[in-house]
């Protein structure tokens, strides 16, 4: 869950988000080292008037600064490709939920059940209860079982939308006429908030997403009541 004036990323709740956090730290370390080296060289050039004539046309130096960037790019690309394949891999999901974007709300359908579907609207500010979050609460939360693989099928009824939950490392575009899919698996129970992340009109910022991850026994009870 995010908090005011937060500078870092949200705490990871899924294996994918854990991998993304590690990749972020890995890449940031490389960028920091390169930036420090460049700033050091620039400071030397500005504070000294010495010129190394032997390096002005050195074949060895040309070779080094051609090969070294290639190695650095490989060190960044390999873990990135691994995470991309992990995000696209879907093996025997335990549950499938179809998500449709509308102007300006989301609708959800649990395809493994005959009649389990609902719309999810943002709760207006004047109707919030004490302790609820402004512009983040919805009237119907998406209840899902924790520690189980859930497949989300995402599309749109009208314009481009985007379904995003930062704590789970999810962001999938909802495109009219196209069905995109992604998977999620939360490692612990709780409420996980997401916000709309596609400019599609005047009320695009009023389409929050709330996932309620619960134990399987609670989910079975909830689904029986909803059906």
From Swiss-Prot:
Reaction it catalyzes: 4 Fe(II)-[cytochrome c] + O2 + 8 H(+)(in) = 4 Fe(III)-[cytochrome c] + 2 H2O + 4 H(+)(out)
Modified sites of kind Phosphotyrosine: 218
GO molecular function, one term: cytochrome-c oxidase activity
Residue positions binding Mg(2+): 198
UniProtKB keywords: Copper, Electron transport, Magnesium, Membrane, Metal-binding, Mitochondrion, Mitochondrion inner membrane, Phosphoprotein, Respiratory chain, Translocase, Transmembrane, Transmembrane helix, Transport
Cofactor binding note from Swiss-Prot or TrEMBL: Binds a dinuclear copper A center per subunit.
Name assigned to this protein: Cytochrome c oxidase subunit 2
This protein's encoding gene: MT-CO2
